[in-house]
């Protein structure tokens, strides 16, 4: 009787409940032999209203003078990092725990890993966007609050800033020799759950734009961009992109696979943009804000007005 009841319950369950609970990106749903939860079906907090990524409308950002410079500790230390294909992205495990403070953060955070999102298309691989513009890739350096600095752990595990992610856009440009050890490591980890070690030591600063540009960033509260999409992330999205050569960018889509059979290339591992809702995006108050347009473009209207005034 119990077996019959269990079978009836299973038969009455909706298709999503019977599907494999393994989550995936939209591109993985297309192969007929793939059964997984696509982004609209992701579980946990993924259907809540304070989600990431978002489109940052720069004209609607609010200046926050408290968003000053970051203090980076251990970011200059070279290390032969462990690199992993986890079935969703390539992840670099930051074992020596670099850390950050400042930048309007409430405390110090330790880096645990970095990973990337990408596409074969040079304008479709970033998760966040600026005024609707997307980039070839996006790199996330994930940090957690240092233990002992969060107060009562049981009370703070649900804090909206328990995790701090530094996000960097990546655009098609000149070859980036500092990224080459990571790019070369991809050949050793084509399938999920494979690990390797970089053949050459790299520091986090090696992977970032020049330090002076790190004063310019956007800030908002959101979530992880993968299940269970916990809403406990303070996001810092930097304005200055990293440059990689097109061949370096395409290597991620060509050398990595979602599946053990190496039939589904790992690409377009990007969550769709989520609604910002009532949240506010802030921008750093550092002087000399990076310009979204070339200086001549911005000066043209001013010069035109001055010319008209002079002629009068």
From Swiss-Prot:
Glycosylated residues in this chain? 33, 152, 195, 265
Q: Mind telling me which CDD domains this protein's record contains?
A: alpha_CA_IV_XV_like
Residues bearing a lipid moiety (GPI-anchor amidated serine): 284
SS bond list: 24-36, 46-229
Q: Top EC class per UniProt?
A: lyase
Where on the tree of life does the source sit, at the highest rank?
Eukaryota
Query: Where Zn(2+) is bound, by residue?
Result: 115, 117, 140
Q: Which GO terms describe its cellular component?
A: plasma membrane; side of membrane
Required cofactors, per record? Zn(2+)
Name the catalysed reactions. hydrogencarbonate + H(+) = CO2 + H2O
Q: Which residues form the propeptide?
A: 285-312
Task: Keywords in alphabetical order, please.
Answer: Cell membrane, Disulfide bond, Glycoprotein, GPI-anchor, Lipoprotein, Lyase, Membrane, Metal-binding, Signal, Zinc
How would you summarize the oligomeric state and partners of this protein? Interacts with SLC4A4.
Q: Which PANTHER family match?
A: CARBONIC ANHYDRASE, CARBONIC ANHYDRASE 4
Family designation: Belongs to the alpha-carbonic anhydrase family.
- This protein is called Carbonic anhydrase 4
Q: Which organism is it from?
A: Bos taurus (Bovine)
């Amino acid at each position: 009787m119990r077996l019959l009841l269990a079978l009836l319950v299973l038969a009455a369950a909706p298709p999503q409940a019977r599907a494999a609970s393994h989550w995936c990106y939209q591109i993985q749903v297309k192969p007929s032999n793939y059964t997984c939860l696509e982004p609209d079906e992701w579980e946990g907090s993924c259907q809540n209203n304070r989600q990431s990524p978002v489109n940052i409308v720069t004209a609607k950002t609010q200046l926050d003078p408290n968003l000053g410079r970051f203090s980076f500790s251990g970011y200059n230390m070279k290390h032969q990092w462990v690199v992993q294909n986890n079935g969703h992205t390539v992840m670099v495990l930051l074992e020596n725990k670099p850390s950050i403070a400042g930048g309007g953060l409430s405390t110090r955070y330790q880096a645990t890993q970095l990973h990337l999102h990408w596409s074969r298309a040079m304008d479709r691989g970033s998760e966040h966007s600026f005024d609707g513009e997307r980039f070839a890739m996006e790199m996330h350096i994930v940090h957690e609050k240092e233990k002992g600095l969060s107060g009562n752990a049981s009370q703070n595990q649900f804090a909206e800033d328990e995790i701090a992610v530094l996000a960097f856009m990546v655009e098609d440009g000149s070859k980036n020799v500092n990224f080459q050890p990571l790019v070369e490591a991809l050949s050793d980890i084509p399938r999920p759950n494979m690990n390797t070690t970089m053949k050459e030591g790299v520091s986090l600063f090696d992977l970032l734009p020049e330090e002076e540009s790190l004063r310019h960033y956007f800030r908002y509260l959101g979530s992880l961009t993968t299940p269970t999409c916990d809403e406990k992330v303070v996001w810092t999205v930097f304005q200055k992109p990293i440059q990689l050569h097109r061949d370096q960018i395409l290597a991620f889509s060509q050398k990595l696979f979602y599946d053990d059979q190496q039939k589904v290339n790992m690409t377009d591992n990007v969550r769709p943009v989520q609604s910002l809702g009532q949240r506010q995006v802030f921008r750093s108050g550092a002087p000399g804000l990076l310009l979204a347009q070339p200086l001549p473009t911005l000066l043209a209207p001013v010069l035109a007005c001055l010319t008209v005034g002079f002629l009068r």
